[in-house]
Amino acid sequence: MVTTGRRVCRSAGLFALCYAAGTFVGPLYAAINENAAARGTSPAVAAASDLKFALDEIVAGFSRDTGIAVRVTYGSSGNFARQIAQGAPYELFLSADESFVMQLADRGLTLDRGTLYAIGRIALYAPNESPLVPDPRLQDLTRRVRDGSSGRIAIANPEHAPYGRAAEQALRSVGLWDAIAPRLVLGENVAQAAQFAASGNADGGIIAYSLALAPPLRERGRFALLPESLHAPLRQRMALTVRASPGAQRLYEYLQLPAARAILERHGFALPED
């Protein structure tokens, strides 16, 4: 049976990751349900949770340069697309799967079809105390699943999280999906899956490479970058919604500058060609 893991944030080092996973997020829209004037000066952004560490750094630079504060909510791209379609007051949407942006554009909910800003990668991650040995072809994981020595493995929910879908594709590519399915623990998004793995709620997880590189995880475990051939490309697209303020427009443009792109690259994202 596929299960959903417990939310555990046992150290200060995982606090930021837990926040991105939704552990400390209040009621839906609580951080963005403010008056129109506030929205105009402090744009509300919905961002895929794999962006947590990279986007925090970019937004900090943007705020220093412009004086504009930004409110970012992290979560799964599929859930954000549904919320925007239902009227959530986000002004800029950074999706981990470009299809969600295209769907909103087709419904007239974005100003245009946006721009491709990054290509994501996935990695097999294991905390230091886990017996699992990460390798690019998932050979140790395969052996452990087949001999019954594997514990639970965390991935994001493939139903609405692009990184969960990529994890499923990778597991299918090596012929492991059917055998490992009963051992999976699903995160609401990839940050929560990473939290489960890093906190010891699972033996490991297939998570965003950008999260595996981040200090809270890198210091607590080890990982192997998986070949791109194991899954469909994670083409990450962003677009301004029809609610976009001038501040959101400025952030959208800032994200396409060389300095912002360099930060994305340093955090493990491949950059699309201009």
Short names for language-model regions:
Residues 8-9, 13, 166:
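Intrinsically disordered, metal-sensing/regulatory segments
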Residues 29-78, 82-88, 95-98, 102-110, ...:
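Exported/periplasmic ABC-transporter solute-binding proteins
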Residues 1-7:
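N-terminal secretory signal peptides that target proteins for export/translocation
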Residues 12-27:
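Bacterial N-terminal signal peptides
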Residues 8-9, 25, 32:
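Intrinsically disordered, low-complexity linker/propeptide segments enriched in Ser/Thr/Gly/Pro
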